[in-house]
Amino acid sequence: MSTNSSFNRSWAKVILNALLRYGVKHFCIAPGSRSTPLTLEALQLQHTQQAECHSHFDERGLAFFALGMAKATNDPVAIIVTSGTAVANLYPALIEASLTQHKLIVLSADRPPELIGCGVNQAITQPGIFADYPIANIHLPKASTDYNASWLAATIEQACVNQQQQGGVIHINAPFAEPLYETDENEINNTPWLKPLQSWLIKPTAKWLNSQSIQSEVSMHENWDYWRTKRGVIIVGKLPVEQGVGIKAWAETLGWCLLTDIQSCVDASLPYADIWLSNNTVHERLLNADIVIQFGSQIISKRVNKYLADFKGEFWQVDEYQRYLNPFAHRQTRFVAKAHHFLRVHPPLRQKPWLLEPLALSQFCASFIEQQVGGSLNEASLAHHIEQVLATNGNLFIGNSLFVRLVDALCKLPEGYPVYTNRGASGIDGLIATMAGIAKASGQPTVGVVGDISALHDLNSISLLSKINHPSILFVINNSGGAIFDMLPVEARVKEQFYRLSHNYEFSQVAAMFGIEYIRPFTWADLKAKLKLAYGRKSATIVEIKVNDQDGSNLYKSLIKQISQAEIA
């Protein structure tokens, strides 16, 4: 019986118990030997119903799965991996989480220091591997009684305190020396080293560091009584669902124009802004606003972003985290606050709308888009009518590239419907895994929509979807390549070979390989009939929508061109 292998478990016990106290309920575990102390302690927490463990064979997909869970729960999610390139595979998801302030905690097992840099197998330099993306990089010493258990608990908890206040990623690198197996449970739990923590260990809610959270109540701007009488525009980017409540009514009372991103979960009073803002007359008149207030960030629309770039008046930014959000270098007033807290201390003054043209053009776009999209099942019509494929109490996850732009431009969703995206770095990697994490953690019917290249990029994450035991429907929009690049002014031959990457793949055999249902509808009636069956199953379904390669991008460009040329009185 090895005392060292048991002590490795005791060391891991302190680390994981510290995480529990700050909201970690899920451990996402990749297979590996060096991480055994962490894995077995996580399983012990699952056995006592204090946490739930999940596994996947690909660390990159596992990390995005964890990100999806963090999005759905708004809690920190821990990832356990072994040493070597397993750690490096987490990087894309950690970048995304860092840019969107979602809480991930990486526990990377490592070789002990004496085995680094000397040619030992599966040993790389792991400390600092994620550069400055984590808010805390903790490189622990090799598990040893030379360090007090209280020091270890305090070190982990302090990182968690920081994460509670600012979101983002924590990296904890934990070297373990062999042996790693054949432990004694009694020895793990009753080592004298743990004695100072006994009262802490038996109370899962007791914290070693009782840090008070920063209570910085937002105050009313000293000149709000002046600004609320002026002409204003409110722009809402990505927001948590609960923060969007009340923004529409607040804007309507003020008589201000409200432009909402599809990620805002706010009912759009002026939908299709990405289309109607292409009209230069309306764009210029909207620039006559005295003040713009922006809630949230990660705005998708190119036209809305252009408006923000062109606006030179008073600019206020409201965001709950102390991060720098100023892509257009505005002279700005920053409010570190949740949106609904800001509204509470800035009462509106009832006024008539100061600009009517956006409403008129938005209403025109509603009928015009319907006419242009038509009744066939295609990329644009699915984006325009996406609400018709959603469950009443479900989630929508939208991938990147062309389709997310089409949804933002052409769709109007009900107030408060949960919409998830990966728009921090806006990559196409890990999208299916992220959707699977959202579906798993929320327990609600979930629809995800990705392009064919995105699906190919994350193909093995369909394995994660196959484990979901409630309706989870993955739409693959197959336009035989990267259709978003049709928007680029690149010579056709070069575009085809190095941008679009056209193919003739289809996804029926992929679904068969992972043992999930597959449907390929050709009409809206066919889709709705088959979706009814899919929602009746407690499992995942792939819906492949095969479309002509340039139809979506051509319609998008045509709508923008026609509305840009419309004459406004």
Curated annotation (Swiss-Prot):
Pfam family, one: TPP_enzyme_N
Keywords, sorted A to Z: Magnesium, Manganese, Menaquinone biosynthesis, Metal-binding, Thiamine pyrophosphate, Transferase
InterPro entries from the UniProt entry: MenaQ_synth_MenD (IPR004433), MenD_middle (IPR032264), THDP-binding (IPR029061), Thiamin_PyroP_enz_TPP-bd_dom (IPR012001), TPP_enzyme_TPP-bd (IPR011766)
Gene3D superfamilies to which the protein is assigned, alphabetical: 3.40.50.970, TPP-binding domain
Note on how the cofactor is bound: Binds 1 thiamine pyrophosphate per subunit.
Enzyme Commission number(s) of this protein: 2.2.1.9
GO biological process: menaquinone biosynthetic process
EC category: transferase
Signal peptide per UniProt: none
Catalytic activity: isochorismate + 2-oxoglutarate + H(+) = 5-enolpyruvoyl-6-hydroxy-2-succinyl-cyclohex-3-ene-1-carboxylate + CO2
GO molecular function: 2-succinyl-5-enolpyruvyl-6-hydroxy-3-cyclohexene-1-carboxylic-acid synthase activity; magnesium ion binding; manganese ion binding; thiamine pyrophosphate binding
Protein's job: Catalyzes the thiamine diphosphate-dependent decarboxylation of 2-oxoglutarate and the subsequent addition of the resulting succinic semialdehyde-thiamine pyrophosphate anion to isochorismate to yield 2-succinyl-5-enolpyruvyl-6-hydroxy-3-cyclohexene-1-carboxylate (SEPHCHC).
Stated family: Belongs to the TPP enzyme family. MenD subfamily.
This protein's name: 2-succinyl-5-enolpyruvyl-6-hydroxy-3-cyclohexene-1-carboxylate synthase
Highest classification ranks of the organism: Bacteria, Pseudomonadati, Pseudomonadota, Gammaproteobacteria, Pasteurellales
